[in-house]
Amino acid sequence: MAKSHLILAALAAEAARGKNFTSTRLNTEKTPGFDSAILESDTDRKYQVLVTTGKQSEAELKTELNALKLVSPLASSTLSVPEIIGETKDSDDSSVVVLSFDESKDIRLGAKNSEPIQLLSAELARIHSLSVADANELEIQNFSPTDLNAELVSEIDKLADTGKVPGVLLSRWEKALEDIGLWRYRPTVIHGSINSDTVGTAGDKLVMRGFGTMRVSDPAEDFGWIAGGSTEQAINTCLAQYLEIREADENLLKRAIFYSEVEIARWLSYCIEIGDDRAAEAAGADLENLAEDAQKSELPSLEATSFIGLNQQRDES
């Protein structure tokens, strides 16, 4: 049973001694696996309390705290990331953490104003430039291209088992996974779950949260959300912004498109699992539309531009 906002406020007060919280509201919709609330203090600052509800959320919270240690030096006038305020345990030995919380506005993909996603691209470039060695020391998960490819093959098989994913899409994705050249990239530190729940804007600043999915993996994973909802021109502008800060292999955008398509099937599978028929129907319709475009050869190619990625070419030269 989910904890009430009063219990969460009491736990927050214990974790963040010295803070005087004056109001509390539940925030469980955007924090699956956690009991969560947003609190406001007598100094008008906002905070988020997170309480784990099982082994999976315990592991995710551990990653979140380690990730924040890694990413906090990047906080600046253009990037807001949560600050760890305090920690404790509740009577069930569940972890309780209080983080700073900045309210933000949603980033509208496809909007004429591309500045927010350009800002996101720039900050992703900085996150992707973080030290992999430091991430390893913090025990953040590390996936090689081979590991990730195997995981994706297994996931596509499970999505196929739902019987809801059109065959033309499964064939498209399986062909992409078999294209060795497409998966030539340098594993980097990534956020791991960029979407409307984890990024937003506050004035000229990007607000980023949800670092519990951070890992060392494919940088293209962080561009799946952008690739799935932006115009081609906006995507190219974002990629250009990214390349001003760090290098990328020439197939990053193709893999981002791959991830954006697979994410629809993931969402469909999740909706079926939780019994949300309406959301599942909508996701199924999106997949059918995607399948129609695939049959008409109207989807971007997922075929690798070359066998050897940009970074590997430069490493070997």
Annotate each predicted stretch with a short phrase.
Residues 27-139:
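ATP-binding pocket architecture of kinase catalytic cores
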Residues 230-291:
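A conserved long alpha-helix in the C-terminal portion of kinase-like catalytic domains
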Residues 1-16, 294-317:
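Regulatory N- and C-terminal appendages and interdomain linkers associated
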Residues 201-252:
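Active-site Asp-x-Gly
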Residues 90, 96-110, 129-133, 153-161, ...:
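A glycine-centered beta->alpha junction motif in the catalytic cores
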